Amino acid sequence: MQATNYPVSLPDSYVHFGKHKVFNRLTNKFDKHDLVRLWSLILNCKQVLEEEIEGDFAEVGVYKGNSAVVLAEIANFVGRDLYLFDTFDGFDKKDLEGVDDKFQEGDWGGVSVDEVKAFIGEAVSCCHFEAGYFPETLTEKHKEKKYSIVSIDCDLYKPIKSALDEFYPLMSHGGVFLIHDYSSGFWEGATDAVNEFCKETGEHVICMPDKSGSAFVRKSK
């Protein structure tokens, strides 16, 4: 029997996605060194939409917009809103305590809202930028909504735990948290925040084999 070779960086579903103009735009913008994360984001968003899970999208920790552009393209395509929370000024000193006290105020800053908007491109029409310290920027207008996808990429314990705690009651049953850096081995605060959250809620982690060890948590309760 003749052996078959498979392109290991691409799932079988590429044959369908590769024909889609939205997907082609994403592969041109997303970090080419972490395509596993791109596929994980796309496939889990697709699953949520196919199951008709109610709610808009949100992201806490935007930085340059690498994952925001994925969420924006998908949200815009299906007519949902995307709420983007970030200081847009790097780490806040209020979060630099405990395991995270080794980092500096302003780390991972230097990217403006306008730069992120330009990076996202035409899909920015569905985006709402909430600049400032989270969760202070989470207002009643946000709490009146339901969410189906919440991406969290804050690196540090305090903002990650706050994002999980604040959005969990707002998340639709079956909605998905996409949390970066969980098993990176470097961002201890990310691991601690997710583990503590899961212990408190009875939810469970699904680990992804991407570059920085993302974890997904699907709301089951």
State each model region's role.
Residues 37-40:
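N-terminal pre-P-loop "Q-motif" helix
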Residues 7-35, 46, 51-221:
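S-adenosylmethionine/decaboxylated-SAM
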Residues 1-5:
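N-terminal auxiliary segments of SAM/dcSAM-dependent transferases
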